[in-house]
Every structure is written in structure tokens, then in C-alpha cells.
């Protein structure tokens, strides 16, 4: 019995030594390096990314790239982001405002984004994906709203402590972000050129500088966000969703961090859109045109355990392939 104990202790010691020796050979852990263009710029130009565990980029069509970037931030919290990079100089690609049931008027929030996108998805006018856009209230979006060159809502609904801003996409596909105060003059000068307009708040970047026009206490919590950034050429656009309110999955962003992200990419202008449970990022997959099942929700809307919220409006990314 004594001999058996000696053998047992000796074997345990050898196993322990072997384990320690193996550990010594693998103690140098290195976080994965970014592989996407977006990931590389965010790592190089911000201090928010501590360790990347997913950085995947794929092209839906020439001029439309998706990047899905997941990481631990500098506080050790999980963050999952979803990005579109869109080149509007590609003659096939357009950004188009959409409404519930493809109505030619604004209405109450009564349709999910995936269903809204499916209404305009057809041969020759192929939906590649989309995001949610403006905050909603009552019978429509809170800001002015244009669809296909037609103004569906011509007034801004006041939002306390958050100056309203608009995004205009002209018929020649130039993207401009301005304030409610600037809208009358912009409309007078560009009304005949305007195609799509949607709104959001607050503005994040103005003329290449961070300028968030809200009281600090409105940026005291990290939330799911949706946002748009525009490069100086006015034809390169970033659309972004970050998930939040789910600790082990993703923890959202403060507005300041959101602004820093778009600054890191080189955006000249950026605007926060409706977030929280409205934040939705959709990529169209193979399938039958007009079928909502073709619309793949890539993020995790935090309403109802990942269920899409009913929305007032959205933005479609379209390939015109006629």
C-alpha cells in the first residue's frame, strides 16, 4: 500500500511538472489583430479596443461592404458593431427612404424593417440591406421626411434638449448633414435636387470636429445606437449599429465614443439616429425577391429578446441592376 502511494505521488508530480512546462511554453497570449479596413482604423485611431474576437468583412455588391466587428473594450466589456461602407459613386447603388407598407405618406410605427425592405425588393431593384433611421412619434418620424423626391413630412417635431438634424441625399447622390435651423435655406437652394431626407439627433461630428450638442447628462449611459457618417467627398457613407443592454453580449456606446469611432474613420460629418430597441442592421441573403425571410437581421434588437421593433421608417441600400 505504501509503494502504491509513492507511485501515485510520483505520477502526480510528473503530471504537474509536465503541465507547468507546457504552460511555460504558452504564456505569451496575443490579442487577435484587426483584419478589416474599419477594424484597423479603429484600433489605430482610438483607445477603446482592447481585444478583438471577430472582424469579418464581406462585399454584397461592388460599392457595398459589410464589416462585423466584435471586441472587448478598454473596460473589459463586450461590444458588437455592424458597419456598412457604401460608395455612392457606383452607378448601381442608391440609398432610399422607406415607409411601412411602402406608403406614399408617413404613418404610425406598424411594420418591422425587414418587412419594409421586402416591399421595395424586386428584380432590377435589389435590396442589399438597410438600417433604421429617425426617431418616431405619433403618426410618423419626428423630423422632415422625403422619399423618392417627394416630401412626406415638412416639419420637425421638437425634441427636448436635442436639436434636430437632417440627412439629405440628392438626386446626384451627394449626402449632406445639416441642422433644423439650416433646413429652410438648404431647401430653398436644393429643393429640386433633393431625393431622400431623414432626420436624427444629436449631431456627432461637424466639419471634421466632434460637436455633440446635448447636455452631458444625456450621454451618461451606454445604449444601443444607430448612426451615419459621411466622408469629405460626400459620396462615401458609413452606416453603423452597435448592440447594447445585454451584458455578456454587447454593452452599447456613449455618444462621445460613437463620435470618436466615426472620427477615426475620417468622417467629416456624423449623426446619431434612433437607437435602443429600434437599432436594426439587416443584410439581404439569397432568396426570393420580396420575401421578408430574405432579410437577415445581423444584430440583436434588444426588444423582446432580439425581436425587431415596429418602426416608422428606415433606409434601404439598393442595387439597381436593370
Please report, for each region that a protein language model flagged, where it lies by residue.
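Bacterial N-terminal signal peptides that target proteins for export
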Residues: 1-9
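C-terminal motif of bacterial Sec signal peptides marking the signal peptidase cleavage site
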Residues: 16-19
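Short beta-strand scaffold segments in enzyme catalytic cores
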Residues: 82-86, 133-134, 165-169, 203, ...
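Structural recognition of the beta-strand scaffold that forms the well-ordered cores
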Residues: 128-132, 166-168, 175-178, 229, ...
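Conserved, well-ordered active-site substructure
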Residues: 140-161, 213-214, 218-232, 236-269, ...
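A substrate-binding/cap region within the structured catalytic cores of diverse enzymes
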Residues: 161-215
